[in-house]
């Protein structure tokens, strides 16, 4: 049986050269699979044709934008997914979807191997390979950049020696990954933590200091899902795209952080994720109004753990599935409208309304109409502080002795 390698194909230098390289190394054929996740840029038909020109026996392009928005971005919103309380999992949530389609392509096209272009220093090698192991452990995995010390210089040399039809543009000093959920930039001069990011790094967001007029937006949620913007019904994909445009124009969603990678090193990362930041901010505000205090407290811990599981490449794992079930059970009443102002790089919530609200005006007001029974408060305070009072009494007495 002839080996067939199913390659996660981006259209760039490394994966273009990987096609003849993998064919030569395995003595088999290469099937290139590319996903449109709303990353923009080059036309996907050009990407498909380039893979064929480089020697792929088949080149498959999948429009996965809606699937990505509905099945990967939406769960991230419901989980308020932020790794280290900052990063909205831009790349992390795209990898399991790519894995899913590569495994499916291997089944449909007789694949015996799968391949990716990740290095040995990053998180993505883990996300891809654990995903392959979870969905089809029979597939053999090849990672040229990691396993064969594949560098850009080696890729160019191999292309020249083997007449691979690629254009050699000036090498960017940065590593960039993007999709509709956001954009990630790393390496280059950013590796010096003292160097500030330059304006040319950004593509999804304008300079927050431009002074554009504030933009007020109302996001409507139904059971945790954004369903309308300013009263207009939207799909999940449309919601992200519109808020990317509007938030990006205000410089919303820029992040500069030092991230704890799964492989044990710290890495400086720049992110642009206007739509993601706006939607998660609005969703958290909707939860504040509609979820009971103890459940909300507990969910914050679950949200953080969910984000870590996804970041660590365990999208298909049993813990993440169980966390999904818990999170989904909390969303029944997360319904209503959140009004926000987008301006000068900030997202500010300034209005909330919900038919499922737990906010009771008559209990909260300090004015006429207050229905809160303040006479019950004294006894509550005594009981609430009783255990702490007893412990402190003991400690004082112990100190005296």
UniProtKB/Swiss-Prot annotation:
Q: Which InterPro entries match?
A: Arginosuc_syn_C, Arginosuc_syn_N, Arginosuc_synth, Arginosuc_synth_CS, Arginosuc_synth_type_1_subfam, AS_cat/multimer_dom_body, Rossmann-like_a/b/a_fold
Q: Where does ATP bind?
A: 8-16, 117
* GTP-binding in keyword set: no
Instruction: Write down the EC number.
Output: 6.3.4.5
What PROSITE patterns does its record include?
ARGININOSUCCIN_SYN_1 (PS00564), ARGININOSUCCIN_SYN_2 (PS00565)
Keyword annotations: Amino-acid biosynthesis, Arginine biosynthesis, ATP-binding, Cytoplasm, Ligase, Nucleotide-binding
Subunit text: Homotetramer.
What biological-process terms (Gene Ontology) are attached? argininosuccinate metabolic process; L-arginine biosynthetic process; urea cycle
Give the CC-aspect GO terms: cytoplasm
| UniProt GO MF annotations | argininosuccinate synthase activity; ATP binding
Binding annotation for L-aspartate = 119, 123-124
Its primary localisation, in coarse terms, equals cytoplasm
What is its pathway? Amino-acid biosynthesis; L-arginine biosynthesis; L-arginine from L-ornithine and carbamoyl phosphate: step 2/3
Name the species this protein comes from: Corynebacterium efficiens (strain DSM 44549 / YS-314 / AJ 12310 / JCM 11189 / NBRC 100395)
Q: What is this protein called?
A: Argininosuccinate synthase
Q: Where does L-citrulline bind?
A: 87, 123, 127, 175, 259, 271
Reactions accelerated catalytically:
L-citrulline + L-aspartate + ATP = 2-(N(omega)-L-arginino)succinate + AMP + diphosphate + H(+)
- A Pfam family recorded for this sequence: Arginosuc_synth
